[in-house]
């Protein structure tokens, strides 16, 4: 990769060794656990909240400090992420900035300790509430497509529908200046906040609400990613794209395809089909 991977502003030792919810130590190499689910999905959409508008930041740098974990543990974690990223590249993802972001984010910190040993395989994994964290390839693929825009890949402001555990938002934070993410399930919204808080990522804004309504108070967006599949993309989301912006979403019921929608003008959008995929269904409203 030509782009040097950024580092989160966190101590990986404090995060990797934090006591998990059940009191067991989280170790991505030695934790026995559940098997991965075959779904390549993320999360349902969320409710439009009426919280005050947060002023936009002006290209605030969001670099990540070098880890202070014991060198052996750090090298193991780095090696696993490098191997995962190399596998994603072999699957066809070529955007060096996306690959660097995937390599920088410790995926095992976003899931239960019992599944940490499977964190870097190319599969989705359960995160609770009948939802999953998407497989690494699909995360990288969707972000790569969104970045391949007419603005040389620059993303000033992006919207994620379906925060889930917060992993994809963390990856997005390294390729976009501002990231807004909506989650409709309250428990997952709180989980994402808990996962991201120690990482001190300044350019992520998490919202609890109905993602099918988007986030008009923060629009327009250069890119929008949906982590749940509807029969069609909600019109409200299309209208929140900036002209030249890109929306990437799974569309369909039993048979789903990844679809790219580009906004050409105020009243015109064009779409193209990318590949088959499988996501959880897009649902309206919220779950408390």
Curated annotation (Swiss-Prot):
Q: Which GO terms describe its cellular component?
A: cytoplasm
Q: Which reaction does it catalyse?
A: [protein]-L-isoaspartate + S-adenosyl-L-methionine = [protein]-L-isoaspartate alpha-methyl ester + S-adenosyl-L-homocysteine
Recorded GO molecular functions are: protein-L-isoaspartate (D-aspartate) O-methyltransferase activity
Enumerate the active-site residues.
Answer: 134
Q: What residue spans carry the region label Disordered?
A: 1-61
Q: Which InterPro entries match?
A: PCMT, SAM-dependent_MTases_sf
Q: Ubl conjugation: is it a keyword of this entry?
A: no
Give each disulfide bond as a residue pair: none
Keyword Secreted attributed: no
Span of the secretion signal? none
Q: Name one GO biological process term.
A: protein repair
The task this protein performs is described as: Catalyzes the methyl esterification of L-isoaspartyl residues in peptides and proteins that result from spontaneous decomposition of normal L-aspartyl and L-asparaginyl residues. It plays a role in the repair and/or degradation of damaged proteins.
As for family, the record states: Belongs to the methyltransferase superfamily. L-isoaspartyl/D-aspartyl protein methyltransferase family.
> What protein does this entry describe?
Protein-L-isoaspartate O-methyltransferase
What species is this protein from?
Herminiimonas arsenicoxydans
């Amino acid at each position: 990769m030509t782009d040097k991977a950024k580092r989160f502003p966190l101590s990986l030792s404090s995060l990797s060794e934090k006591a998990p919810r059940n009191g067991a130590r989280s170790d991505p190499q030695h934790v026995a656990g559940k098997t991965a689910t075959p779904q390549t999905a993320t999360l349902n959409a969320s409710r439009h909240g009426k919280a005050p508008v947060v002023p936009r930041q002006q290209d605030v740098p969001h670099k990540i400090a070098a880890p202070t974990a014991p060198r052996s543990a750090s090298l193991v974690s780095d090696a696993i992420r490098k191997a995962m990223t190399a596998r994603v590249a072999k699957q066809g993802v070529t955007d060096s900035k996306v690959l660097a972001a995937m390599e920088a984010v410790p995926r095992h910190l976003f899931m239960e300790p019992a599944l940490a040993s499977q964190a870097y395989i190319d599969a989705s994994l359960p995160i609770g509430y009948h939802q999953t964290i998407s497989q690494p390839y699909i995360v990288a693929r969707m972000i790569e497509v969104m970045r391949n825009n007419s603005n040389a890949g620059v993303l000033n402001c992006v919207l994620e529908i379906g925060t889930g555990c917060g992993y994809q938002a963390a990856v997005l934070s390294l390729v976009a200046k501002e990231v807004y993410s909506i989650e409709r399930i309250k428990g997952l919204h709180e989980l994402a906040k808990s996962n991201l808080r120690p990482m001190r990522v300044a350019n992520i804004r998490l919202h609890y609400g109905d993602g099918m309504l988007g986030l008009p108070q923060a629009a327009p967006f250069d890119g929008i990613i949906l982590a749940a599949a509807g029969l069609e993309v909600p019109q409200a989301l299309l209208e929140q794209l900036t002209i030249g912006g890109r929306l990437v979403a799974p569309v369909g019921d039993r048979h789903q395809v990844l679809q790219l929608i580009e906004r050409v003008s105020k009243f015109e959008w064009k779409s193209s089909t990318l590949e088959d995929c499988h996501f959880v269904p897009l649902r309206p409203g919220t779950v408390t």
